[in-house]
Curated annotation (Swiss-Prot):
InterPro entries linked to this entry: DNA_Rcmb_RecR, Rcmb_RecR, Rcmb_RecR_Znf, TOPRIM_dom, TOPRIM_RecR
Originating organism: Roseiflexus castenholzii (strain DSM 13941 / HLO8)
Similarity field: Belongs to the RecR family.
Zinc finger (C4-type): 64-79
Protein name in UniProt: Recombination protein RecR
């Protein structure tokens, strides 16, 4: 990787960390440099704990075998909770969307995480996400309702359309979050009140 002139005066371990941090979403070279020098000044325990947490993240976290949310076990905490309504499944694009919906406190069903959306221009088709796994699940489990909670943008709406068409013959009620979420936004950034209202006001597709 070509290094800016101002980085060439720095020790190699410092340059390497700046470059690696710069690869994270939302972290530019300036922020990466500030974080690196903060860690350089920090007590040894902090960078060591951070390194261990990063290693643990990749070694100990996996996808739930049922809904594809993140977990340390075969089933995630939501799927393993008998108090959740097993007959309702909310379909979201990413794990952070589950966190956003849970924050509302109004939803007590299960989830299905697609890990993406249908976006042909980005090379993302139904085979690249957990689309068909949802269909298999609806066939195998006594699910009465599928709530489609993909993002209110072009790709999210396209994904919702394809999901509705595929789910229609399977017998479950298919609903979509009510209008009111900011168009073009991501579910994870919606405030809990607005998202909760969209869930409670969901409409038939």
């Amino acid at each position: 990787m070509h290094q800016p002139h101002d980085l060439q005066i720095l020790p190699t371990p410092v340059i390497r960390l700046i470059e690696e941090l710069s690869r994270l979403p939302g972290v530019g070279p300036k922020t990466a440099s500030r974080l690196t020098f903060f860690l350089l000044r920090a007590p040894d325990e902090l960078p060591r704990a951070l390194a261990n947490a990063l290693i643990g993240l990749k070694q100990q976290v996996q996808l739930c075998s049922r809904c594809y949310f993140i977990t340390q076990n075969d089933l995630c905490a939501i799927c393993a909770n008998p108090a959740r309504d097993q007959r309702i499944v909310c379909v979201v694009e990413e794990p952070l969307d589950v966190v956003a919906i849970e924050r509302t406190g109004v939803y007590r069903g299960l989830y299905h995480v697609l890990h993406g959306r249908i976006a042909p221009l980005e090379g993302m088709n139904r085979e690249d996400i957990y689309f068909d796994e949802l269909l298999d699940r609806v066939r195998a489990e006594p699910i009465d309702e599928v709530i489609i909670a993909t993002n209110p943008n072009l790709e999210g709406e396209a994904t919702a359309f394809h999901l509705q068409r595929a789910l229609a013959p399977l017998g479950a009620r298919v609903t979509r979050l009510a209008r009111g979420l900011p168009t073009g936004g991501d579910l994870e950034w919606a405030d809990p009140g607005t998202l909760g209202s969209a869930l409670e006001g969901r409409r038939e597709m």
